[in-house]
Structures are given as C-alpha cells and as structure tokens.
Amino acid sequence: MKWRELSAQDPPRRFRGETYWARPLPAFGDTRASILVVGLAPAAHGGNRTGRIFTGDESGNFLFRAMYEAGLANQPDSLRRGDGLKLSGALVSAAARCAPPGNRPLPQELDNCREYLARELSLLPPAAVLVALGALAFDACLKVLAQTGCEMPRPRPRFAHGAVLRIGSHALLASYHPSQQNTYTGKLTPPMLRKVLLRAAREARKTGDPSSLRSSG
C-alpha cells in the first residue's frame, strides 16, 4: 500500500471522518497561464487529503496568500476544493504527484513524475516563467527544461533563493519552499515570497502574453 493511502487510514484526530483523496494530484489553476509554480509534493494531510495541491495546510495558506498579494489569486486562503479559489495567469504543480513519507520523495519518484510536469509546461506559452519552490523543485525544473531541448547553463546552476535564470525562452525563478520549517523560523517570510512572485509576474508580462490577466480555477 502506498504512503498516500496509509496516511488516509490513520489521519490526525482533527481530520478523522474525512474522506481522503489519496491519489496522485494534478496541477491546479489557470490552464492558459504564463507562470508555472512548482512545489515538491503533496502533503500527506494537505493536498493528499483535500485533492488539491497546496490546499488544507499551512504551506498552502502561506503560498496562496502571497499569490493573492501578487495579484495571481482571487482570495488568500486555500481550504478545500470548491472553496472559490481561482488563479489568474498562474498554474501550480509539483515535482512529485503523490504524498511521500517525511515529505521527501525518492529520486525514482521524481523521475517517474517528470513527464507530467513536462506535459504541463508544454501546454503553456513558449516563454512561460517557472517558479521553483525549494531545491528539489528547482532541480526538477532544470531537468524538465533540459528534456525539452533547452541549452543548460554551464556550470550547472545551483539553487539560491531569489535566483533568476534565463534558460532557452524561459525564465526560472527560485524561492525557498513555504514549508513550516522555513516559514516558522523566518527563513522564508511573506515579503520574500511575494517579491519572487511579483518578479515572476513582471517576467511574464515581458513576453506580451495576456494570460496573466485571465482568471480560471
């Protein structure tokens, strides 16, 4: 039995009685977006429970509040599917599609899920902007861009919060992941994440793609 299913069988007391999604999670947001936000993996009692990426946990609240303040979401909260949240010009995805033990997917899991991330990127404009949340998501984005034929910088870029790379027709921006480990310690603050997202929106506008003005949930 997979971890996503085991987590659903023995949830914390506050979630007992809920029906868990407990399946791979798709991306969420504006399918005509010019910004692709890439996290690591669904949380066992967040997205794995609610059926929507970055939904139902503190990491999601932190992310979507920043997206709301950057003009990419219509509300600051992400509680459950059907809560009215809509994204404008942004699609939120993840490097791994199933909740992993300890929030740490194995390399093989990341390799297996890369095709889904590549497919999502292929549906977006040729100059779509990528925002990687954390080092593993950053690495996944680099591998996907290489897979699509983009020439990789040499030496290979290393993750750093606030980094902005030009790879092929894309801009790749990096941010610390909005995990509680980072947000509770102040390693990542709301202004820090908001600054990265605002920069992503500016980069998207440079492409001349009007998708950042459209809203879709």
Question: Model segments located where?
Answer:
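A polyanion-binding, active-site-adjacent surface
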Residues: 1-159, 163-205
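N-terminal basic, low-structured, amphipathic or hydrophobic segments
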Residues: 210-212
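A cross-taxon signal for low-complexity, glycine/charged-rich
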Residues: 216-217
